[in-house]
Amino acid sequence: MNEETNEPAREEGAAPSSGSQTTPQQASVAAGLCQQIYGELNKVFFGQDQVVSQVLASLLAGGHVLLEGKPGLGKTHLVLALANTFGGNFGRIQFTPDLMPTDVTGFTLFDMKSQTFQMRHGPVFTNLLLADEINRAPAKTQAALLEVMQEQQVTIDGQSLKLEPPFMTLATQNPIEQEGTYPLPEAQLDRFVMKVIIDYPDQASEEEVVGQVTQKASAKGLNAHAVQQVCQPNDILAAQKECAEISAVPEVVRYAVNICRATRDSQGISLGAGTRGAISLIQIGKAYALMSGRSFVTPDDIKSASLPVLRHRVQLAPELAISGQNIDDAVAGIVNSVEAPRV
């Protein structure tokens, strides 16, 4: 307690309090909810703790995720299980070269019987949307989805329809099969708050997956419906609001901006992160803080967020790419070169 002002003492690292900021008590409750969701997902998605944390942080931040991983690593399973934890609707689109924008958003159809136009909603009208192999559809179809992601609404024949929140797109890419694909342009990649890499699990986790799947003769895979629903969609919306109101002091904001500016000035980088990259760093930093039960962002939150937030926003110069330089190593080196503030 501050004796001169008769106000509660401020937490170290937190900004001065205001009515619109998340309180430590609210952060603690939200962190408990996150732990429940995290625990349920870990029951059916083994050995991928970091992936689960990153996807959950993106949901709290109200962002969309680009998932990259080889086939058979459980991307669909993860998204369906996440939807089940809060009773949300799940939708899936398999992107193919012949997929049309109306296959994504929906269309109007004239009903001969009633002599009226009927609205047919597309699969984007859901809470969690899995856009499988998004880079296999042509640019026009990709753009239709990315517009929905940005605007949170669909326009069909001049009629604008709002999506029911929460809405999150998780788009997948296969890093191996690139033949016949349409790479996402940089401006569209920038719409994803994170690029999450799903790798093979460790041996113990892989043995557990194989053991569970082969326990029953009729089993075709892990059961994403085995997770328990621990909250409602409105609880996710409340957590997103509290996440947005987590405190980020000017020094932490400056740190995020400095990291992004450093990517633009670094030798060997042909394209650095833009302002949206710094915004995403703060948004994910707030999510990490909330998941930890804190009402303020620390420099460590920003540093932890930097790799998944920036890896798809930064491009190596051709000579480094040809030599086999890894983009993750380049980003990590840049982040480590930027001095973190002491707050």
For each of these PLM feature ranges, what is it?
Residues 65, 129, 167:
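Conserved beta-strand position immediately N-terminal to the Walker
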Residues 27-70:
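Pre-Walker A (pre-P-loop) alpha-helix and adjacent loop at the N terminus of AAA/AAA+ ATPase modules
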Residues 54-57, 110-130:
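Conserved alpha-helical scaffold flanking the Walker A/P-loop in AAA+ ATPase domains
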Residues 111-116, 137, 141, 149-246, ...:
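Canonical AAA+ ATPase core
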Residues 69, 132-133, 144:
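Walker B catalytic acidic pair
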Residues 59-96:
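Walker A/P-loop
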Residues 70, 104, 172:
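P-loop (Walker A) phosphate-binding loop of NTP-binding proteins
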